[in-house]
Amino acid sequence: MAFNMDPKKCPMPTQDPNVRNKNFKEVALGYTAEMAVNEAKRCIGCKNKPCQSGCPVGIDIPEFIAHVAEGDFEAAYQVINRSSSLPAVCGRVCPQESQCEGKCTRGIKNEPVAIGRLERFVADWHRENVHTAPIVPEWNGHKVAIIGAGPAGLTAAGDLAKLGYKVTVYEALHVAGGVLMYGIPEFRLPKAIVQQEIDGLKKMGVDFECNMVIGKVLTIDELMGEYGYEAVFVGSGAGLPRFMNIPGESLKGVYSANEFLTRSNLMKAYLPTSKTPIRTGKKVAVVGGGNVAMDAARSALRLGAESVYIVYRRGMAELPARKEEVEHAEEEGIIFKTLCNPVAIHPDEDGFVHSMTCIEMELGEPDASGRRRPIEKPGSEFELEVDTVIMSLGTSPNPLIRSTTPGLETNKHGCIVTEGDEGKTSRAGVYAGGDAVTGAATVIKAMGAGKAAAKAMDEYIRNK
């Protein structure tokens, strides 16, 4: 096979920015088969597989890419499926540039192989062309419970189902999917794709119980007692938003990004007939610089805002969001106001947001995170005229589970404490992973945690 020594990735086709910023259709259109084969031929098949070491779920990346280069897309899918339960999701939202692609040998002198785009292509090809029913293993006589139907919980459920366990997933919301459904907008991750992944788990025998708030409707003790589950995995995520505690944060028109995106993505609160309407406004400020901030800003634009600002206390180089998401936001007309920070939000005569006072910042010495610490510039305050403010400052786990589970150790941030990488908690038979343990992190890291915990749960039950 002839290698493709093009120094750059095959570009991803996308919707025109001036069209897509008015609709919720997926921005990235995906590779054609010809594009995928050509891009796969850029892989030089390193024997030591550095890219695989950057994948939290350990996909054999050179092997699946070699199959793509040969045009055997189903074989490529089977390689991915050995390690990942959600390839169509990961191919779209994982930060490959800091994981698998960040370790790619081609990336030392040129652009790395577009591993994420190839994973997405393979998953989409399989979904559109292969319609065989999954193999359902024989029941091994044991049953387990999963709390939370997000990426960690879905991964743990899938891996345990493959081992023959009777798996029940308890989800607090009315639909399964967790952050994949409520947090990531349609234009970045179509909900039909997430639903198809969930349907695949159902075909394997996984049961889903929605509208079940564990810690309120049922407790972990009840699940392991009268319900008879031999082990429980807690993958309940981190849905409790953080705020700045500045004057005016309780005004009408101030939202957490979590609330704004949940109501937009799941509850269609932007419709005039909604019982829980969301006020988008014409001039929107999103405070924060991560992927969630980009999602909120780009959603607000699509919901009719005329001007949308990203207000971030560090510079463009320090933005934690994926480079691709920042580029897409800029292309769509999002205005970046960096090196500034809100200090107060002001109301109009009816109690709605009217403006926001910000102060200019400069970067000092690195802080504990390794990034340069933002410092206020005295006397540099200025007014930003806005009518909606969305706070995207991170999230922490909901305290409900820890407050109703005696003996479950948590840290000062409310995250569940686990032992090593297995997800073992201070309670026998209780495992945890994903954002409930780490705080807000990436989809693929949550999946890696779910995968490791599933293996540990299997060993625990077999050795009882």
Q: Residues of each region from the PLM?
A:
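Ferredoxin-type iron-sulfur electron-transfer modules in oxidoreductases and energy-metabolism complexes
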Residues: 20-39, 59-92, 109-138, 264-265
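Iron-sulfur cluster-binding cysteine motifs and their immediate structural context
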Residues: 45-70, 89-122, 168, 175, ...
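Feature captures the FAD/FMN-dependent oxidoreductase FAD-binding
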Residues: 75, 138, 143-147, 195-246, ...
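Glycine-rich dinucleotide-binding loop and its adjacent helix/turn
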Residues: 121-138, 196-216, 241-303, 411-421, ...
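N-terminal Rossmann-like FAD-binding beta1-loop-alpha1 element of flavoenzymes
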Residues: 142-168, 293-301
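Rossmann-like dinucleotide-binding cores of NAD(P)H-dependent redox enzymes
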Residues: 169, 173-203, 207-208, 297-344
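FAD-site-proximal beta/loop scaffold in flavoenzymes
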Residues: 250-281, 366-440
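A conserved FAD-binding loop/helix module that cradles the flavin
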Residues: 436-462
